[in-house]
Curated annotation (Swiss-Prot):
Mg(2+) binds at S102, D241, D243, D245. This is Phosphoglucosamine mutase. It holds the Pfam family PGM_PMM_III. GO terms for molecular function: magnesium ion binding; phosphoglucosamine mutase activity; phosphomannomutase activity. HAMAP family: GlmM_B. GO terms for cellular component: cytosol. It comes from the Bacteria. It comes from Shewanella piezotolerans (strain WP3 / JCM 13877).
Length: 445
C-alpha cells in the first residue's frame, strides 16, 4: 500500500503555520475530505475542537472547504474528542472532525476524522483524501453548497452521556477527587460530570486562555495533580489530556496510575462480574508487568502496534472489548467506540464502588517493571532503525536484560523522534541502557 504523506497515526498534526498545518492546507483538506466522504453518501459533518487559539482558524478553513464540496457542517465549539465521536453518532452525521493536537503544546494543532459510528478512518480512506489533495480545488454550484449551523447544547448532552456509564444505584458521595483538565477541551465538562455524580471535586487546569493547553498540567505532566492530591488529602486524582481522549490517575498517596494499571483494573472488574469477553489488547509499549498480572488471572493478552486505532483493529479481530495504551488511551467497546478519558475514569470509579476498594487495593495485584522512555530527535540524520551502530547497541542491551526485560525502538507517527523504551527489573540499569541507545542515535547526526 502507498505510504501516507499527510496523515500520521492520529490524523494530521504539526506546528501551526508551517508544514502541514496551514490555513491553505486546511481549506484544501476540508474540500478533499468532503469529496471522498460525499462519494460514500456523506451529507453532514460535525466539527469540534480543543482550546488552542488556532482552533478558530482551522475551524473556519475546514468549514469553507467542506461547504465548497457540498457538505453541511455542524459546529460544536470546544469539546473533547470522544464527545465529537458521540455527537456524530447521535446527530446521525456521517462524519466527525476534531481540531486538536491532543497532548502537544498550544503552538501545534491537528485534524482527525471519524466515521459515522465514531471510529477512525482506515489508512485506505486517508490515502483517498490525499489523492484528492493533489487535484485543483473546485466548488460545487451555488445551490449545492453546504450549510453551516451550530449545536448549542452539545456540552449538556455529553455530560449526560458520560454519567450514563456510572451505575444508577451508586454514588460518588464521600469521595474527594482532583480533576485536571489540562486547560483543554474537558474544562467545562469533566468537573461537572463528577460533581453531578456526587463527588467533591477540586478542579485544576480548568482555565484555558488559548495558549496554556497542556502547560505543566494534564495527563502528560503529572507533577501538579500529584501535589494537589496530597495537599488536599484527596482520595484520588484524574488527569485528562488536551482533547480528553486519554486519562492518567493518582492514588491517595500521590502515586501515578497509568493506562496499563487502568486496563488491569477494568479487566479484573469485568472478570469478577463475569462479563469479560475474551482478553485484553495492549501495545508494544505496554509494561511487561501488565502481561504477567493478566497471565496470573488466566486473562489472554496481545500487543498491537502503538496507536489506539491499531488497538481497535485487534479488538475487532479477536471480538474482545477492553484494550488501550499505557499513555492512557483506554477502549472499552461496551462503553463507546473511541478512547474516552472521562468515561474510563467513571468505569474505574464504578469498580471502586462495587468492590468498596481504593485505587491502591485495586492495583495490588499488578507490579509494574521499571520502564524508561527516551525521545531522541533524528531530523536530518540517517534512519536510526537502519543503523548498524544503533542496532548493535540495542542487541547489547537485550543480551544484558535477558528474559526479564524488553527493548523497543519506535519512530513517532507525528514528530521526527525515535522513542527508545527499555524495561527491566532495576531502574538504574534500565535508565543507563536507554541512555546508551539514545546516545548511539544522537551520534548519527
Amino acid at each position: 500500500m502507498k505510504q501516507r504523506q499527510f496523515f500520521g497515526t492520529d490524523g494530521i498534526r504539526g506546528k501551526v503555520g508551517a508544514g502541514k498545518m496551514t490555513p491553505e492546507l486546511a481549506l484544501k483538506l476540508g474540500w478533499a475530505a468532503g469529496r471522498v466522504l460525499s462519494r460514500a453518501g456523506t451529507h453532514k459533518v460535525i466539527i469540534g475542537k480543543d482550546t488552542r487559539i488556532s482552533g478558530y482558524l482551522f475551524e473556519s478553513a475546514l468549514e469553507a472547504g467542506l461547504s465548497a464540496a457540498g457538505l453541511d457542517v455542524m459546529l460544536i465549539g470546544p469539546m473533547p474528542t470522544p464527545a465529537v465521536a458521540y455527537l456524530t453518532r447521535t446527530f446521525r452525521a456521517e462524519a466527525g472532525i476534531v481540531i486538536s493536537a491532543s497532548h502537544n503544546p498550544y503552538y501545534d494543532n491537528g485534524i482527525k476524522f471519524f466515521y459515522t459510528d465514531g471510529s477512525k478512518l482506515e489508512d485506505a480512506v486517508e490515502l483517498e483524501i490525499e489523492a484528492e489533495l493533489e487535484k485543483p480545488l473546485t466548488c460545487v454550484e451555488s445551490h449545492l453548497l453546504g450549510k453551516v449551523g451550530r449545536i448549542d447544547d452539545a456540552a449538556g448532552r455529553y455530560i449526560e452521556y458520560c454519567k450514563s456509564h456510572f451505575p444508577a444505584e451508586q454514588t460518588l458521595s464521600g469521595l474527594k477527587i482532583v480533576v485536571d483538565c489540562a486547560h483543554g477541551a474537558t474544562y467545562h465538562i469533566a468537573p461537572s460530570v463528577f460533581k453531578e455524580l456526587g463527588a467533591e471535586v477540586i478542579a485544576i487546569g480548568d482555565k484555558p486562555n488559548g495558549l496554556n493547553i497542556n502547560d505543566k498540567v494534564g495527563a502528560t505532566s503529572m507533577a501538579k495533580i500529584c501535589e494537589t492530591v496530597l495537599e488536599e488529602n484527596a482520595d484520588l486524582g484524574i488527569a485528562l489530556d488536551g482533547d480528553g481522549d486519554r486519562i492518567m490517575m493518582v492514588n491517595r498517596h500521590g502515586r501515578v496510575i497509568d493506562g496499563d494499571e487502568i486496563l488491569y483494573i477494568l479487566a479484573c472488574d469485568a472478570q469478577k462480574r463475569g462479563v469479560l469477553q475474551g482478553g485484553v489488547v495492549g501495545t508494544l509499549m505496554s509494561n511487561l508487568g501488565l502481561d504477567l498480572a493478566l497471565q496470573a488471572l488466566d486473562i489472554p493478552f496481545v500487543r498491537s502496534k502503538v496507536g489506539d486505532r491499531y488497538v481497535m483493529e485487534l479488538l475487532k479481530e479477536h471480538d474482545w472489548k477492553i484494550g488501550g495504551e499505557n499513555s492512557g488511551h483506554i477502549l472499552n467497546l461496551d462503553h463507546g467506540t473511541t478512547g474516552d478519558g472521562i468515561v474510563a475514569g467513571i468505569l474505574v470509579l464504578a469498580a471502586m464502588c462495587r468492590q468498596s476498594a481504593s485505587l491502591e487495593e485495586l492495583t495490588a495485584g499488578i507490579t509494574m517493571l521499571p520502564q524508561v522512555l527516551v525521545n531522541v530527535r533524528f531530523e536530518g540524520a540517517d534512519d536510526p532503525l537502519s543503523s548498524e551502530v544503533v542496532l548493535a547497541a540495542k542487541a547489547e542491551v537485550e543480551q544484558k536484560l535477558g528474559a526479564r526485560g524488553r527493548v523497543l525502538l519506535r519512530k513517532s507517527g507525528t514528530e521526527p523522534l525515535l522513542r527508545v523504551m527499555v524495561e527491566g527489573d532495576d531502574r538504574a540499569d534500565v535508565t543507563q541502557f536507554a541512555n546508551d541507545i539514545a546516545d548511539a542515535v544522537r551520534n548519527l547526526v
